[in-house]
Amino acid sequence: MESKTINDVVVSESNHELASSSPSEFEKNQKHYQEIIATLPHKDGWRPKDPFVEYGGHWWLQPLLEGLLHAQKFFKARPNDFFVCSYPKTGTTWLKALTFAIANRSKFDVSTNPLLKRNPHEFVPYIEIDFPFFPSVDVLKDEGNTLFSTHIPYDLLPESVVKSGCKIVYIWRDPKDTFVSMWTFAHKERSQQGPVVSIEEAFDKYCQGLSAYGPYLDHVLGYWKAYQANPDQILFLKYETMRADPLPYVKRLAEFMGYGFTKEEEEGNVVEKVVKLCSFETLKNLEANKGEKDREDRPAVYANSAYFRKGKVGDWQNYLTPEMVARIDGLMEEKFKGTGFLSSKS
């Protein structure tokens, strides 16, 4: 296999440049990333030993920022790649399962789909996490894999993702449910960085944009504007709308991906079978996603079960005060005023 050297880093010319590089090569670059990060503004995070770092107008946890810097420099997207983009806790796991099931339904029927045995995150790798930190996982070594994911804001995506013409699906969720899901999810992390702050303190930080991957509303708005400018390249979905009536959106997603369902498949209830396979209820109750079971391909700071809490719409009502609700609703109204977003059905 032919290789070339870029800035003293050996880069494979196979799948996505660094897909076959060893972790030690990332570590050589990691020191440089850490030197950059040391010069950037820091603020207290949701844990006492886990501060946020400002970069590119967004706030980051240091490991994620190291991964971003690496992906920006080395990840090379191809025109036929497909990206699941989202902010944390907005429906990512569900959307990963759907894209994998849609793209691979000619290889597996519902009874043999690998999703029944392993967590969806193993099949759709993060370019800012798996790509830099775990480049030897099977999915990154598979030259035929075209499914990738990221929580990176649109304006900081690797240049090749935007310019290659590869397609993107973005999912967003009510910011109140997103916050509650993030805060409860943080408690499930196997962390040595100290306890998670109270829900009141975390909410205040969240409203200031101090959460992983920066201000949530800016994240949504960035992808919304990109979708408005490039509707053929970006599909924009709303979690609550999909949960209420998944069938038409799964068909729309499949068509957008280039894997549209045939008339015969629709008559054979294949769409319904895909929806059921990837449903919250099905995935949550699989042995692979119960208890403290971990993903099989690499170490993880979360058990597989952490990704399946309730999957419900409106759970924020059990956590937020009227004052909190008014604050986040006001921020949303202000952020999206004049953008056409609030009147959209997406």
UniProtKB/Swiss-Prot annotation:
EC number: 2.8.2.38
Top-level EC class as recorded in UniProt: transferase
pH dependence remark: Optimum pH is 9.0.
Reaction catalysis annotation: an aliphatic (Z)-desulfo-glucosinolate + 3'-phosphoadenylyl sulfate = a (Z)-omega-(methylsulfanyl)-N-sulfo-alkylhydroximate S-glucoside + adenosine 3',5'-bisphosphate + H(+)
Pfam families named in the record: Sulfotransfer_1
Residue numbers annotated as active site: 151 (proton acceptor)
Tissue specificity note: Highly expressed in roots, stems and mature leaves. Low expression in young leaves and flowers. Barely detected in siliques.
Family: Belongs to the sulfotransferase 1 family.
UniProt function note: Sulfotransferase that utilizes 3'-phospho-5'-adenylyl sulfate (PAPS) as sulfonate donor to catalyze the sulfate conjugation of desulfo-glucosinolates (dsGSs), the final step in the biosynthesis of the glucosinolate core structure. Substrate preference is desulfo-benzyl glucosinolate > desulfo-6-methylthiohexyl glucosinolate. Increased specific activity with increasing chain length of desulfo-glucosinolate derived from methionine. Preferred substrate is desulfo-8-methylthiooctyl glucosinolate.
Listed name of the protein: Cytosolic sulfotransferase 17
Phylogenetic lineage: Eukaryota, Viridiplantae, Streptophyta, Embryophyta, Tracheophyta
